[in-house]
């Protein structure tokens, strides 16, 4: 990861960081850094399921972190999607994603029971605005009942 996408502390240079797998932050999310025992800064979303535990138990290992003005690579975001199991629903959803120039479908898994499908889509997006637009478009697809960013 290149350090020009994030500003850590008072713009500390050369810090190694990784995006936490528990919450998969993307450009535009509110984030904080957690200095791991290996000395690597793990970047978490402020609404991460682990954030409260970190704040309570390790406040001294937290470091202020914010995004710089530069949008970098694509970030993986997982969406949970529920809807009516119709023929062509997956094709409709994937074509919506394929039409977005700033989004890439990375993974899809869908299960169907009793006429209802549930699935997870992993998409590559450059920022939260792109993700919100994509969620809005997918939610308007015929048969889709709910689309949310998964944690």
Give the role of each language-model region.
Residues 103-106, 144-147:
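Short, well-structured beta-strand/strand-turn elements
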Residues 116, 124-129, 143-146:
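Charged, surface-exposed alpha-helical interface/stalk elements
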Residues 82, 122-124:
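Short hydrophobic/aromatic beta-strand micro-patches
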Residues 1-80, 85-90, 99, 106, ...:
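N-terminal non-catalytic structural scaffold regions of very large proteins
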Residues 77, 117-119:
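Short beta-strand micro-motifs in enzyme catalytic cores
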């Amino acid at each position: 990861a290149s350090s020009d996408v994030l500003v850590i502390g008072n713009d500390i240079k050369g810090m190694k960081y990784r995006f936490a797998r528990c919450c998969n932050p993307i450009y535009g999310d509110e984030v904080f850094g957690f200095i791991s025992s290996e000395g690597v800064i793990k970047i978490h979303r402020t609404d991460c399921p682990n954030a409260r535990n970190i704040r309570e138990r390790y406040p001294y290992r937290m470091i202020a972190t914010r995004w710089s003005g530069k949008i970098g690579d694509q970030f993986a975001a997982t969406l949970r999607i529920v809807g009516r199991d119709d023929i062509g629903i997956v094709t409709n959803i994937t074509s919506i994603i394929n039409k977005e120039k700033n989004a890439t479908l990375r993974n899809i898994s869908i299960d169907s029971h009793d006429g209802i499908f549930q699935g997870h889509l992993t998409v590559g997006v450059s920022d939260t605005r792109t993700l919100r637009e994509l969620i809005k478009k997918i939610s308007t697809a015929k048969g889709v009942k709910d689309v949310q960013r998964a944690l």
